[in-house]
Amino acid sequence: GGDAIATDFFPLDVTDFGPTIRKIQAAKPDIVVSVLVGGAHMSFYRQWAAAGMKGEIPLASTTFGVGNEHRVLSEKESDGIIACYGYFEELNTPANRDFLGRLRARYGDRTPAVNELAMRSYDAFLLWAEAVRRAGTADRMAVIEVLESNISMTGPSGTVTIDAPTHHTIQDVYLGEVSGGAFKVLETYREQPPADTAAVCDLVANPTDTTMYDINVDL
């Protein structure tokens, strides 16, 4: 557990993070968590490194790498940043190596980087295709019925299972750290359920529920 001792929010066009970095230096927290996004916010990571903060206070993020920031920043600016996602392109598994090999064989020099968001979309298509195959039809309600039967498929990110009550997924989660401009996978957490959503949402018991829940996540 832990306590958040301060929180800052920034417009998407902000490029000067000096005041916030100075506040962090004064507060000396155990860790800093960034959810910054967009081109302007890349300045934070550059200024963080320039202020000598790398190695002083760990920096984690729930967004870093999704926009391929680690491929844009220098190693000096990005090495050591920690992120946790359901997929990293650097996963060293047979399924992922096969997927990337086929992707590169098809697109060659035009092969795009594959991040968490891209893989989630790919997984969704694979799950839908498997549900259509099992249902024997593309009829919407028939496919939903199959999807709610805890259907699973195994792809580049690992095994992904639909959690019927939440319509979210049970999936492997990976903890990674940027090293040399790429993510190094430090830990693997198998078949993690959508526990936060499951605490408030059950679409099997309440199939017409359209509530937008405010989920509080304990630190």
Which role fits each region the language model picked out?
Residues 1-219:
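Extracytosolic ligand-binding ectodomains
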